[in-house]
Amino acid sequence: MAQVPVSKEPRHHLVFENDKVRILNVLVPPTDTTQYHVHSTPSVFICFTKTHTGSQRINEQPEYSTSVAGNVWFEDLSEPHIKIHRVWNMDTSVFHVMDIELMSKEKSFVINTQAIHHAHLQIDSPWARAYSIQLAKNEDLRIKNQPSDFILVAINDAEIKMVENGKESTSFIKASEYYWINANDIFSVINAGYARADFTLVSIK
């Protein structure tokens, strides 16, 4: 049965790539099914919707589940753990998830987990760490002189004020919008709205 690399599967949209990560924004419409595709790198997955879905590994029986908005998990999908599967949407709205493929061949951090105010460690893997962040109105996340690169991903829609290396901006962001933060950058984001702003912060090896 034909399979394609996950980055070439039509519902997996490449939105960012460098030598460390490849970010795929995955959108599966109601009643739609992906092609069989191959996951072959360690990956962090971030879900943005509550959706009833089915999935099937090649030559295996289907499995069914309901995704949870804000759920974040890690899978080591490098050899010999490669996954070949397809996914279909059994619900009435779009299934939305982000796949952050981790491209580094090294498997260990040289630094301990980092203490960042409002950031709570969820995943501690050899390739990446992920932190959950919940900001009430006027609360902020500050990243300064950290030795790792980061990806900050919005879990829900929010109004924010952001300062990056002294440059300030205010915007309304949507779930799945992301920011790449270079090591040693000075970066902060403030919740400028009334509703809670949720994020996932991924520290990259």
Can you name each region flagged by the protein language model?
Residues E79-M103, D157, N182-K205:
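Ligand-binding loop in jelly-roll beta-barrel domains
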